[in-house]
Amino acid sequence: MRTESIKTNRPMDLLLQYLQPISVALVVIALVWNYGRRNPTKKLAPEASGGRPIMGHLHLFNDGELTHRKLGAMADTYGPVFNIRFGSHKTLVVSDWEIVKECFTTNDKLFSNRPGTLGIKLMFYDADSVGYAPYGAYWRDLRKISTLKLLSNHRIDTIKHLRSSEVESCFESLYSQWGNGEKSGEFAPVRMDSWLGDLTFNVVARIVAGKKNFSANGDVGAQRYKAAMDEAMRLMRFFAFSDVIPSLSWLDNLRGLVREMKKCASEIDSIMATWVEEHRVKRNSGGNSQLEHDFIDVCLDIMEHSSLPGDDPDLVVKSTCLDMILGGSDTTTVTLTWAMSLLLNHPQVLQKAKEELETQVGKNRQVDDSDIPNLPFIQAIIKETMRLYPAGPLIERRTMEDCEVAGYQVPAGTRLLVNVWKMQRDGNVYKGDPLEFRPDRFLTSNADVDLKGQHYELIPFGAGRRICPGVSFAVQLMHLVLARLLHEFEITTVEPETKVDMAESGGLLCYKIMPLEVLIKPRLEI
C-alpha cells in the first residue's frame, strides 16, 4: 500500500473515522483525566479551552491554518505561556523571548531532550543521531564531535575551498542557463528555488561525503540519494497517529505509512553505508588527499585513533553525517528562497543592497568571503529574513523533570513548544511595524542582535544545549550566495509589477509553497 492511497491527511477526519466506535471508552478516560488534573497545590499555566478527551486540542488545528499561526493567535488570547494537548501529549507553548530565555538557561538541562516523531525514528536513525539522542554521555560525545571536529571555526576554514568550488560550479550553471552570454541584453527564466536547492545540497554533500554534482544532470548515485531524501521529506509531512496518540500507533501500520517509511529508510541507509565503505576503501588504498578530507574522513580518523561513542561506530558515522546533510541543506535553501522573494517584493531594499555591493566591491570582480564583513546590509537582510520566516517556526523539547517556568509548575514529560515565528514578530522588541520587511532595523535599533543563540529575541537556529551546531557555516554560506546573486545578476519577477506569492507550508520546515520563477541576466563588467 503506497502512502498516496491514504484518503486524508487531516488529523481530525482520521480521528473521527477510527474513534467513533469507542466513544464509551472516551467518557471513562475523560473522568480519569479530569480527576488527575485537579491538584490545588500546583499552579499550572492556563490551558486553552476546547480540549477533548484523547484527542486534546487536535480538532482546533483541522481548519487548514498553519500550526505556528494558529498557536500565535491563541497566544493573543491566553498569553505568552499556556498549555495545550496534542493528543495525549501535554504541551507548554511559549511565545515570549524572556520566558524562552528562562527555559534555555535556568532550565536548559531539563529541556535538553527532543521528542522524536515516527519519521525521525524510522528514517533518520532516531536516538542514534546527534539531533535526537537523549541528553546524556552518548549525546555529549556526539555533540563534541560535531562542534569540535566537524563544524569548528578551524574546520570551516579548512574546508572553505571545497565550499567555494561547489558555489563556483553552481554559479557557472546559472550563467549557462542564461545562455553563456549569447542572449546579450535579454533576460532568461530560472526556477530560483530549485537552483538554490541544488547549490546548498551540492555544497553540503561535498563537505560531508565528498560527493559532487547533485543536480538533475548529476551521476546516478547522486540522483538516487536526492530522490530518497525527497521521498523522506514527503513522508514526513503525513499525519502519524504515533506522534500524538501512541496507543493508536497500529493505525499507522494499517494505513501503510510505516511500511513506506521503512522502505525509504532502507534506501537511505544503504546509500550512507556505501559512502562510508567507499571512504574506507579509498583510505586503505592510500588515495585520500588531505585537501579533499570530508566529514566522513574525519569520523573515520576518530575511529582509528580513539573511538566513537556507542556500540556501532559505522552507525554513528552514518547518523552524524546524515544530520549534517539534513541540517545544512534544507534550512539554507528555505532561507535564501525567502530572502530572494522578499527582495523582489521590496525593490527599494533590493536597490539598497545593490548600492552597497557596488560601493564595497565594484562591478569589475566577484564577491569574495573577505568582502562579507564590509557588507552589513547584506547581513541584515539574512537576519530580517530569518526573523520573519524562520526555517523552523517551532522549536520542540521535552522536560526530563518537574520544573518551573514563568512561575508555573511544569510536570516531567511535558513538551515545550517555542513559537519562534510569533516571538520574532514582537512589537515590543522590533519597533515600528514588526510585520514589515525592514533589514535596516538590524543596523539601528536592533544592531546588537545576532544569530548565535545568545539573543533570545532572534533564535532561528535554536538556543541552549541543542542549538544547531552549524550556525557559523550556514550563515557564511547564505551571506556569500546572496551577495553573489545580487551582485552578478539582474533578477526580476516573470510578470512585471507582480508580487511574489508568499504562501508558506506547515510542518518541520516553513517552505515557500509556490515555485520562485524569476528572470535573470548578468550585470558585471567582467
UniProtKB/Swiss-Prot annotation:
Induction: Induced by elicitor. Keywords: Heme, Iron, Membrane, Metal-binding, Monooxygenase, Oxidoreductase, Transmembrane, Transmembrane helix. Repressed by cytochrome P450 inhibitors ketoconazole, metyrapone, prochloraz, ancymidol and cytochrome C. Its EC number is 1.14.14.97. Optimum pH is 8.5. It is found in: Membrane. It is a single-pass membrane protein. One of its GO terms (biological process) is isoquinoline alkaloid biosynthetic process. Optimum temperature is 30 degrees Celsius. The chain crosses the membrane at residues 14-34. Mainly expressed in roots, and barely in stems, leaves and carpels. It catalyses: (S)-cis-N-methylcanadine + reduced [NADPH--hemoprotein reductase] + O2 = allocryptopine + oxidized [NADPH--hemoprotein reductase] + H2O + 2 H(+); (S)-cis-N-methylstylopine + reduced [NADPH--hemoprotein reductase] + O2 = protopine + oxidized [NADPH--hemoprotein reductase] + H2O + 2 H(+); (S)-cis-N-methyltetrahydrothalifendine + reduced [NADPH--hemoprotein reductase] + O2 = 7-hydroxy-8-methoxy-11-methyl-17,19-dioxa-11-azatetracyclo[12.7.0.0(4,9).0(16,20)]henicosa-1(21),4(9),5,7,14,16(20)-hexaen-2-one + oxidized [NADPH--hemoprotein reductase] + H2O + 2 H(+); (S)-cis-N-methyltetrahydropalmatine + reduced [NADPH--hemoprotein reductase] + O2 = muramine + oxidized [NADPH--hemoprotein reductase] + H2O + 2 H(+). InterPro entries: Cyt_P450, Cyt_P450_CS, Cyt_P450_E_grp-I, Cyt_P450_sf, Plant_Cytochrome_P450_Monoox. Heme binds at residue 468. SUPFAM superfamilies: Cytochrome P450. Involved in the biosynthesis of the isoquinoline alkaloid sanguinarine. Catalyzes the conversion of N-methylated protoberberine alkaloids N-methylstylopine and N-methylcanadine into protopine and allocryptopine, respectively. Can also use (S)-cis-N-methyltetrahydrothalifendine and (S)-cis-N-methyltetrahydropalmatine as substrates. Belongs to the cytochrome P450 family. This is Methyltetrahydroprotoberberine 14-monooxygenase. It comes from Papaver somniferum. The lineage of its organism: Eukaryota, Viridiplantae, Streptophyta, Embryophyta, Tracheophyta.
